[in-house]
Swiss-Prot record:
PROSITE patterns: WD_REPEATS_1, WD_REPEATS_2, WD_REPEATS_REGION. GO terms for molecular function: protein serine/threonine kinase activator activity. The gene is LST8. This is Target of rapamycin complex subunit LST8. Changing G138D: In LST8-3; abolishes repression of RTG1-RTG3-dependent gene expression.
């Protein structure tokens, strides 16, 4: 499998797609809840699904419909999942107000970190020693895994839920987005840790709710998804100027993923469709249809 493209959502199914043809090649039933987020390990062996109160791992290389591991312990929807570099541990966030760090090989008692509000996303710093999370009260927290505590907190906008965070692959930048349509960007001048966040810009990306913010792997583009039925791509090198508005979904756009070369974007929407866009032409290259309810998460690995 050179290209792995997966989507999931409210119809309790996980769907694998042939990216070029648009054919659904495999469907996994996720019967007990919707799927909120998807994450593929960088070795392309495992798919993580974040559902209601649990995270499950599926073997990508077989047709086994059953999870190879299940991680129970959250008391609410799991809102994000992220793998450490060599996939030995993973971190999850939840509406129950906690972040949990799990040993992938033994789904036993995780390490816990607590927010005072539902946690919408957690990401791992490239140094693998810090976590950065955001919550519904509008707080960003930085957690030092060595010190086992929160070392920094900032609140860009009081009482405005921060829905999504994205960390640059080289540790140089952090981006966050909220329910008012605002994006915040910070530089991390020393790249090696998150101790010094230098504000770069704040801009209005959408007139309403932003559901996802994502930095491309080459740190040249920033994508935002919104309740306004669009996804937008912004140029980092050109002072976050709007590059492209992807217009075509009929309902909320919930999630997106860049291709490895940052030339394409995949989006997932409440209109049941997943779409592959050519960012240079704004055209829909492929539409993936098969979900019976909203598609709210997507994962792509084409490295």
């Amino acid at each position: 499998m050179s290209v792995i493209l997966v989507s999931a959502g409210y119809d309790h199914t996980i769907r694998f797609w042939e990216a070029l043809t648009g054919v659904c090649s495999r469907t996994i039933q996720h019967s007990d809840s919707q799927v909120n987020r998807l994450e593929i390990t960088n070795d392309k062996k495992l798919l993580a699904t974040a559902g209601h109160q649990n995270v499950r791992l599926y073997d990508i290389r077989t047709t086994n419909p059953n999870p190879v591991a299940s991680f129970e312990g959250h008391r609410g929807n799991v809102t994000s999942v992220s793998f450490q570099q060599d996939n030995r541990w993973m971190v999850t966030s939840s509406e129950d107000g906690t972040i949990k760090v799990w040993d992938v090989r033994s789904p036993s008692i995780p390490r816990n970190y607590k927010h005072n509000a539902p946690v919408n996303e957690v990401v791992i710093h490239p140094n693998q020693g810090e976590l950065i999370s955001c919550d519904r009260d509008g707080n960003i927290r930085i957690w030092d895994l060595g010190e086992n505590q929160c070392t920094h907190q900032l609140t860009p906008e009081d009482d405005t839920s921060l829905q999504s965070l994205s960390m640059a692959s080289d540790g140089s930048m952090l981006a966050a987005a909220n329910t008012k349509g605002n994006c915040y960007v910070w530089e991390m001048p020393n790249h090696t840790d998150a101790s010094h966040l230098k504000p770069v810009t704040k801009f209005r990306a959408h007139s309403t709710y932003i559901t996802r913010i994502l930095l491309s792997s080459d740190v040249k583009h920033l994508a935002t998804c919104s309740a306004d039925h669009t996804a937008r791509v912004w140029s980092i090198d050109d002072d976050f100027k709007l590059e492209t508005t992807l217009d075509g979904h009929q309902r909320w756009v919930w999630d997106c993923a860049f291709s490895a070369d940052s030339a394409y974007l995949v989006t997932a929407s409440s209109d049941h469709y997943v779409r592959l866009w050519d960012l240079s032409t704004r055209e829909i290259v492929r539409q993936y249809g098969g979900h019976h309810k909203g598609a709210v998460c997507v994962a792509l690995n084409d490295v």
